[in-house]
Each structure stands twice: as C-alpha cells, then as structure tokens.
C-alpha cells in the first residue's frame, strides 16, 4: 500500500549518526493532511484519495470549495492533491508523518526554483567560446544546424526560460521522523524553494 503526505520545505541542515557519519538532510514540515474525498470506480471512474494541506482563510475560498471541505468538517485548504493505491481512509480522517519511519524509501515531488530567462550555457551546460579579445564567440548558442533544411530543428539548445518545472526525485531515504513537530527529515536535497509544496509518497522503484 502506498504512503503519501503533503508538506512544506523548511530548508536543509545536517545531522550526525551515532557512528559519527555526517548526513545532509532536507527538513519538511507536514502538518496533518485531511482526507477531503475518497474516489471510487463507481462514482469517479478511478480510485484515489484526495487530501488537503495548509489551512487558508475562508474569505479566500468560493462557495463550492467551502462546501467541498465542509463534508470533511475542516477549513479550506491551500493545496489539494490526490494519492492512488491508498486504502482504509475515510473522509475527515487525518494523515500524519507517523506513517513513515526511518529507513523508508520515498519519491519526492516539488517545483524547481525559477531562474528566469537564461542563456544556453547556464540552461543547457554548453561550453563557452574563448574569452580573448580577438574571439568573436563567447557565450552564443553556436551553430543553428546545416543549411539544407532551411530551418532550425526542434530540440536545439537555445536560450529561454529556465526552472519552475515539476520534478520528482526518486528513491530518497527517510532519515528521521519527528511526530511531535510534524517534521520529516529526508536524506539529500529535494526540488523547490523554501516554503514550497512538497509531495512525499512511497517509492515506485524501490529495491525489494
């Protein structure tokens, strides 16, 4: 059965094991998620559990949103997402970090930091040209391709908007869970800026 929870990225820190090993970790605050809806094949065509995270003021919600969360007897939520392959949950039930334990392998999804409009060197890792005064090529994208097609092929590495993409990092290890603070520590870094939404769920490609 899949485990899943929504949280916010707090930042990175480091911890030491009893043997003195240094481990960089990302701190994710995951206050209790509330089950807003349980979808079934009969009613929705597929099975999933819809959960809400992070309360927001009622004045920021419209009537349909208020009516939807009222069924779960909770406040309007800023983030609403779905998890599949989760069973045994009912509307209004809370999901906490206690379902995870140290050693679990998870997939973490977040939105990467937006970098704005960037050149080919930063965006695609291309090599720059000589920086000498006589050089006529420093940080340009390079050749656009052969003359014959009379066009630039799709996929050519050019300058453009960088970042702000939804990215999933797979097979990260849960180092520690602190239920009293609603905090989970995950080994390494995860995509996203501080305070951004993070989705944690059981790894789909974990070694068995």
From Swiss-Prot:
Disulfide bonds: none annotated. Gene3D superfamilies: 3.30.160.810, Translation factors. Residues 116-146 are annotated as: Disordered. The keyword Disulfide bond does not apply. GO terms for molecular function: rRNA binding; structural constituent of ribosome. Part of the 50S ribosomal subunit. Forms a cluster with proteins L14 and L19. One of the primary rRNA binding proteins, it binds directly near the 3'-end of the 23S rRNA, where it nucleates assembly of the 50S subunit. This is Large ribosomal subunit protein uL3. It comes from Streptococcus mutans serotype c (strain ATCC 700610 / UA159).
């Amino acid at each position: 059965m899949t485990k899943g929870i929504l949280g916010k990225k707090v930042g990175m820190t480091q911890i030491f094991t009893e043997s003195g090993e240094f481990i960089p970790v990302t701190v994710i605050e995951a206050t209790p998620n509330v089950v807003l809806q349980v979808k079934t094949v009969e009613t929705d065509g597929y099975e999933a559990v819809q959960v809400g995270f992070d309360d927001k003021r009622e004045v920021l919600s419209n009537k349909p949103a208020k009516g939807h969360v009222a069924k779960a007897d909770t406040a309007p939520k800023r983030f609403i997402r779905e998890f599949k392959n989760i069973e045994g949950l009912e509307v209004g039930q809370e999901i906490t970090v206690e379902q995870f334990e140290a050693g679990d392998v998870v997939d973490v999804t977040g939105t990467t930091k937006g970098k704005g409009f960037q050149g080919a060197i930063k965006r695609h890792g291309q090599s720059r040209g000589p920086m000498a005064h006589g050089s006529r090529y420093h940080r340009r994208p390079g050749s656009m391709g052969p003359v014959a097609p009379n066009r630039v092929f799709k996929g050519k590495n050019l300058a453009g908007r960088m970042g702000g993409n939804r990215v999933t990092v797979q097979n990260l290890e849960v180092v520690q869970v602190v239920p009293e603070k609603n905090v989970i520590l995950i080994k390494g870094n995860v995509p996203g800026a501080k305070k951004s939404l993070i989705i944690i769920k059981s790894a789909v490609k974990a070694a068995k």
